[in-house]
Amino acid sequence: MATSAIQQSSFAGQTALKPSNELLRKVGVSGGGRVTMRRTVKSTPQSIWYGPDRPKYLGPFSENTPSYLTGEYPGDYGWDTAGLSADPETFAKNRELEVIHSRWAMLGALGCTFPEILSKNGVKFGEAVWFKAGSQIFSEGGLDYLGNPNLIHAQSILAIWAVQVVLMGFIEGYRIGGGPLGEGLDPLYPGGAFDPLNLAEDPEAFSELKVKELKNGRLAMFSMFGFFVQAIVTGKGPIENLFDHLADPVANNAWSYATNFVPGN
């Protein structure tokens, strides 16, 4: 098929050339002839975060970026030193894994900090610190979700483990196996019921939101790693560590903890 389509104008009977990647939309009738307008459907987002001129990971010194990183996808800064994305199938898999882990990390970062914030503002929890909360199940009263026994009351670690494995295992197995649910939808951005606010209605705005999601997701993954390290080194939650640092920045910082840390203490 040729790259241009011929459109007959009903206004003057003249022939005009229009790109074939445009979408035909009927808007009215004039003098018995159909009047049509065309809305261009862009093949790539017109955003500074996409394409060959997008920001690179080394700014103006990033000239020799891999040829397979073209800026087609969100979050592509041209950095792949290890060549992990050279194979298209591996690249697609890594993109999916990054988006999924980004979303889990953002939820995790919220779950690690929000209970501590609420606790410091008078909301009572059985245990607000994220890495200590699970141990409440071994207490005599068991584990109450949000400190309320009327919500979720758990007393068996084996039951929680079994439910977690069954539910998550089923969902992940279904996703990887490619069940019929969701056929024809983008596996990463399905839309529909998963977009109740219709944030993806505007393609340009949606392309920007994809970049923002990955930026925040990558930051959240680093944050979760930091929370793990804090828990091991200080034995405190992220909010308590923040308050300690603000109270005495010289004594409570990464350098002082790293130089004084003794494993097992």
UniProtKB/Swiss-Prot annotation:
Disruption phenotype: In plants silenced with microRNAs, functional LHCII thylakoid protein complexes where LHCB2 is replaced by LHCB1. However these LHCII complexes are impaired in light state transitions, leading to stunted growth in high light. Binds at least 14 chlorophylls (8 Chl-a and 6 Chl-b) and carotenoids such as lutein and neoxanthin. Chlorophyll a 1 binds at W79, S85, E98, R218. Chlorophyll a 6 binds at H245, A254. The chain crosses the membrane at residues 151-171, 219-239. GO terms for molecular function: chlorophyll binding; metal ion binding; protein domain specific binding. Induction: Accumulates at stronger levels in low light than in normal or high light; more expressed in growth chamber conditions than when grown in the field. Repressed in leaves exposed to desiccation, cold and high irradiance via a metalloprotease-dependent proteolytic process (at protein level). It is a multi-pass membrane protein. Chlorophyll a 5 binds at K212, Q230. The LHC complex consists of chlorophyll a-b binding proteins. Component of LHCII trimers made of LHCB1, LHCB2 and LHCB3 subunits. Associated with super- (PSI-LHCII and PSII-LHCII) and mega-complexes (PSI-PSII-LHCII) containing LHCII and both photosystem (PS)I and PSII, in state 2 (red) light conditions. Belongs to the light-harvesting chlorophyll a/b-binding (LHC) protein family. This is Chlorophyll a-b binding protein 2.1, chloroplastic. It comes from Arabidopsis thaliana.
